[in-house]
Regions:
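Active-site anion-handling motifs in enzyme catalytic cores
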Residues: 1-314
Length: 314
């Protein structure tokens, strides 16, 4: 039996990988799980042809993970519809819609969502969006279920005793231009934690994508100029790829006494581990805001959100 897993960018960073791993573990009798890579230029007919070429029996098509673009979502919906037409069971598990993928307008091909045997989403915002699209069934909210992974403590031996401040902050000129004028407010919100050793908790490979290592390093340097980060090898891309995993990141988060982030995965791991979180939301930073709202009843004591206006365009 074959299970086809449809994701947007399944291996781009630890956040997407954590969702894929959780989904694979959660599928009963999954058989052989194949992560499908769709040609962005393929037509609906060509997508149906892809389904026909996969060795039978294809028993299940699963839509999962964080989708960022409307095109990738509509392609995946078209592929899922072809799978259903070929007799496969359709499941939506831990789906998250962000940015363009979560736009108000109902996407092409959304009718297949009403054929899902299971309709389960990662967060409340995605559930609200699906409801706005007029689906016949109400989605179930799983509330970042990948946060419950068993931590891997392999990297903890390299950390010093005492309280540690964990940071994971999205990089980019616009982001830094927004938070840097508010550094005194951030330091005040941290209180004594501003003087603790700093552990980077970035989810992207250094130098790739949103590069939250650059953002993390910039904030750490503003808080404690000249102070080296803990586990400096994580700032090297090959070392990071070799050393880190979702389970190891969760262990690092759990070792912190406070986590500062605008990333949803470190925040969700912190909530699961009982570590307070200072969320930094630049303007409408949906990922951290959605995470806080979805897990509002579980936030550890001392957690809070600091809203930061977006810097004016240069």
């Amino acid at each position: 039996m074959t299970t086809l897993l449809l994701c947007d960018v399944p291996f781009r960073d630890l956040g997407h990988l954590a969702i894929v791993q959780h989904t694979q573990r959660s599928l009963p009798d999954a058989g052989r799980v194949t992560v499908v890579k769709l040609d962005p230029d393929a037509s609906p007919a060509e997508l149906a042809g892809m389904v026909a070429k996969i060795p039978p029996p294809v028993k299940r098509v699963v839509l999962s993970g964080a989708f960022l673009t409307r095109h990738a979502l509509e392609q995946s919906l078209a592929f899922a519809a072809a799978g259903v037409a070929a007799g496969a069971r359709f499941v939506v598990h831990n789906l998250s819609l962000d940015a363009e993928a979560g736009a108000t307008l109902r996407p092409d091909g959304a009718d297949v969502l009403d054929l899902a045997a299971v309709l389960a989403v990662r967060d409340h915002r995605t559930a609200t969006q699906l409801t706005c699209w007029g689906l016949a069934q109400q989605p179930r909210i799983l509330a970042y279920p990948e946060r419950h992974i068993t931590p891997d403590a392999a990297l903890l031996a390299g950390l010093p005793p005492g309280p540690i401040l964990g940071i994971a902050l999205r990089g980019g000129d616009e982001m830094e231009a927004s938070w840097r004028p508010r550094i005194d407010d951030i330091a005040a919100a941290l209180g004594p934690a501003a003087d603790w050793p700093i552990l980077p908790l970035h989810t992207c490979p250094p130098g790739v994508g949103e590069d939250d290592f650059v953002g993390t390093r910039a904030l750490a340097g503003a808080l404690r100029p000249g102070t080296p980060l803990l586990l400096p090898e994580l700032g090297d891309r090959p070392s990071w790829a070799r050393c880190i995993s979702p389970a190891r990141l969760k262990a690092l988060v759990g070792r912190c006494a406070l986590v500062v982030t605008n990333r949803d995965l470190p925040a969700a791991y912190a909530v699961a581990a009982g570590v307070p979180v200072l969320g930094l939301a630049v303007e409408l930073d949906r990922r951290i805001l959605t995470c806080f709202a979805t897990l509002a009843n579980e936030l550890p004591r001392g957690s809070r959100m600091l809203r930061i206006p977006l810097a004016p365009a240069a």
